[in-house]
Amino acid sequence: MRRTGIRLSWRSVDDLALRPKTLDEYIGQERLKQKLRVYLEAAKARKEPLEHLLLFGPPGLGKTTLAHVIAHELGVNLRVTSGPAIEKPGDLAAILANSLEEGDILFIDEIHRLSRQAEEHLYPAMEDFVMDIVIGQGPAARTIRLELPRFTLIGATTRPGLITAPLLSRFGIVEHLEYYTPEELAQGVMRDARLLGVRITEEAALEIGRRSRGTMRVAKRLFRRVRDFAQVAGEEVITRERALEALAALGLDELGLEKRDREILEVLILRFGGGPVGLATLATALSEDPGTLEEVHEPYLIRQGLLKRTPRGRVATELAYRHLGYPPPVGPLLEP
């Protein structure tokens, strides 16, 4: 397809090239980075592998990216896998015995989804760097002990409550990733723009950051879509005005609410008088899966003060009424 009128400069850079390589390049999470610098320097001074590390927090905050940064800072290799991919102990043994060298890092995303059998075989690997494998079946079965290289396990989870106590106790370092500020998200947008050869104003980057739900992954995604609109329009620079037009075209309002988020609040207000209403009833009214409603949409609405979960059900707040342009209920709100 022939393209015309496109004046934005373009540089072919893949996601790996955009990924920061050092803690200094990694934007945000300042308190965590300060502690990590200490842990990394101490491990390098002792010439020992970094202690096993568990990172937890909502999706899209950069847990995988941080694992890559840690590996780069230590000058070691990183092997990436996920809990669901390790179905049986043999899968774990193949990774630990064949893919890792002394000091390397194994990153397991969604570690809370490890099978119980695989998790139990992980315990001695984390503690003593050995793993016992049963060969054969029945009376002829025998156990072989695998000596493993001293490695670091970095686990990542969005649901720390599902991590079993025995597994949690084997992590020497447990850290939480926090949501980003709009200013930090704008910095991430500006960095990606520079690497991609795209010109964008700080004001435009900040508008993207304000609508990114405190999540760097969302900010990067929105920036790419805003870039698309500006590129097709033949703009040389992404200005605040162009960014606002693109974000509006994407269905995002000034709080970062998408169309589905607003529909949830509107149904709650217009059909159920603001609530309280049970999750299952609300999901049925929206033709939505209750799990999607609870895990995908509600957390951000609650963080923004637009929705409350109460013992009697979901309640729209006064702020939700005002944001959507509806008069709030007269008198005290339905639930405190």
UniProtKB/Swiss-Prot annotation:
Keyword line: ATP-binding, Cytoplasm, DNA damage, DNA recombination, DNA repair, DNA-binding, Hydrolase, Nucleotide-binding
Superkingdom of this protein's organism: Bacteria
Protein function: The RuvA-RuvB-RuvC complex processes Holliday junction (HJ) DNA during genetic recombination and DNA repair, while the RuvA-RuvB complex plays an important role in the rescue of blocked DNA replication forks via replication fork reversal (RFR). RuvA specifically binds to HJ cruciform DNA, conferring on it an open structure. The RuvB hexamer acts as an ATP-dependent pump, pulling dsDNA into and through the RuvAB complex. RuvB forms 2 homohexamers on either side of HJ DNA bound by 1 or 2 RuvA tetramers; 4 subunits per hexamer contact DNA at a time.
Protein name per its UniProtKB record: Holliday junction branch migration complex subunit RuvB
Location of the region described as Large ATPase domain (RuvB-L) in the Swiss-Prot/TrEMBL record: 1-180
PANTHER family, sorted: HOLLIDAY JUNCTION BRANCH MIGRATION COMPLEX SUBUNIT RUVB (PTHR42848:SF1), PTHR42848
Binding residue positions for Mg(2+): T64
Origin organism lineage: Bacteria, Thermotogati, Deinococcota, Deinococci, Thermales
Family from the record: Belongs to the RuvB family.
Annotated domain remarks: Has 3 domains, the large (RuvB-L) and small ATPase (RuvB-S) domains and the C-terminal head (RuvB-H) domain. The head domain binds DNA, while the ATPase domains jointly bind ATP, ADP or are empty depending on the state of the subunit in the translocation cycle. During a single DNA translocation step the structure of each domain remains the same, but their relative positions change.
Catalytic activity: ATP + H2O = ADP + phosphate + H(+)
An example Gene Ontology molecular-function term: four-way junction DNA binding
Cellular-component GO terms for this entry: cytoplasm; Holliday junction resolvase complex
NCBIfam families, sorted: PRK00080.1 (NF000868), ruvB (TIGR00635)
Stretches for region Head domain (RuvB-H): 254-336
Species, as recorded: Thermus thermophilus (strain ATCC BAA-163 / DSM 7039 / HB27)
Annotated spans, Small ATPAse domain (RuvB-S): 181-251
Residues that coordinate or bind DNA: R309, R314
SUPFAM superfamilies, A to Z: P-loop containing nucleoside triphosphate hydrolases, Winged helix' DNA-binding domain
UniProt keyword annotation of DNA damage present: yes
UniProt keyword annotation of Hydrolase present: yes
